[in-house]
A protein has these predicted regions:
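Short cysteine clusters
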Residues: 86, 105-108
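N-terminal pre-ligand scaffold of iron-sulfur
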Residues: 1-96
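General beta-strand recognition
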Residues: 80, 102-104
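Short cysteine/histidine-rich zinc-coordinating motifs and their immediately flanking basic loops
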Residues: 96-102
Length: 109
């Protein structure tokens, strides 16, 4: 987008975004990466993983971001979130909710 967007802390100096910002597919795709991938997303409360060693696959904003993650509750009752993709082969690691101490790639073993 070549048009300059004036974002000013003083609302009196700010301007309305150009119509192209709301209609251009390239701007939308760029916004998904620049805005939505860098912010927090609510994916559930801790009641779904009360048991220890539980692994729950979640897709963040399906059909929009399609970011696969794993919610994991360790045996020490510590809830964490990890990418659900093997960084080497791009393989999905956890396909359904399960109880396991380890996350194991089906490709690597």
């Amino acid at each position: 987008m070549s048009e300059k967007i004036n974002v000013d802390k003083d609302i009196k100096l700010a301007e309305t975004l150009p119509a192209k910002f709301y209609k251009d597919k390239n701007i939308f795709e760029s916004s998904k990466k620049k805005i939505f991938l860098k912010c927090w997303h609510w994916i559930g409360d801790n009641s779904s993983c009360k048991e220890g060693n539980i692994k729950i696959p979640v897709d963040i904003l399906p059909k929009f971001l399609n970011e696969p993650v794993i919610i994991s509750n360790s045996d020490k009752n510590k809830i964490k979130c990890f990418s659900n993709v093997c960084t080497h082969r791009g393989n999905i690691l956890v396909h359904e909710k399960c109880k396991s101490k380890k996350i194991i790639c089906n490709y690597h073993g």
